[in-house]
A protein has these predicted regions:
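Residues lining hydrophobic/aromatic ligand-binding pockets adjacent to catalytic sites
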Residues: 1-174
């Protein structure tokens, strides 16, 4: 699930899901992981991260996305300080951090694989990373996709399978 509280959940998905400050603790009684999509848009305050760490058992895992400034604005270049800041902010989660997701824009294509390789090489080796690509060439079963997979293998990074071809089959309604 992409969040641990939702306005439609009380008395539905969780039979006795109250609106409260301990929603994460209640969520963690039913699920053992959560994707924190919000870190793509903004970074949480340190006190919130500490509260999250204290709200779940040791076997619970958080998955967070790298911030969009890292992935979309800088496209993985010249963002060492932002990466360090985000990883430092999540330090209170320690062993509860499951995966850091690297969601790349469709404009990040095969010509930028060397940038991805350098970025992954600079990350702490103990960090579990998953990469989501959206450029169509990475789904064409050709040399570009093979090259991407080789980069991921070399850096022990996972690949998120989000085949975007269906998103691009209809007309653009910008």
């Amino acid at each position: 699930l992409p969040m641990w509280q939702h306005s439609h959940w009380p008395n539905t998905w969780f039979a006795n899901y109250p609106k409260s400050d301990n929603a994460l603790s209640i969520y963690a009684q039913e699920c053992n992981t959560v994707e924190g999509n919000t870190t793509f848009y903004s970074l949480p305050h340190q006190d919130a991260v500490i509260r999250w760490a204290n709200s779940v058992n040791d076997d619970f895992r958080f998955t967070f996305k790298f911030h969009q400034n890292i992935t979309h604005v800088h496209q993985l270049q010249h963002c060492e300080e932002e990466v360090a800041q985000q990883l430092s902010l999540l330090t209170p989660l320690k062993d509860k951090l499951g995966v850091m997701m690297l969601q790349l824009p469709a404009s990040f294509g095969p010509d930028k694989l060397s940038v991805l390789e350098q970025f992954l090489a600079a990350l702490p080796t103990e960090l579990n990373v998953a990469v989501e690509v959206r450029h169509l060439a990475f789904f064409a079963k050709g040399d570009e996709e093979k090259a991407l997979n080789q980069v991921l293998i070399r850096h022990n990074a996972n690949r998120i399978i989000m085949d975007t071809r269906a998103l691009f089959t209809g007309p653009c309604n910008n």
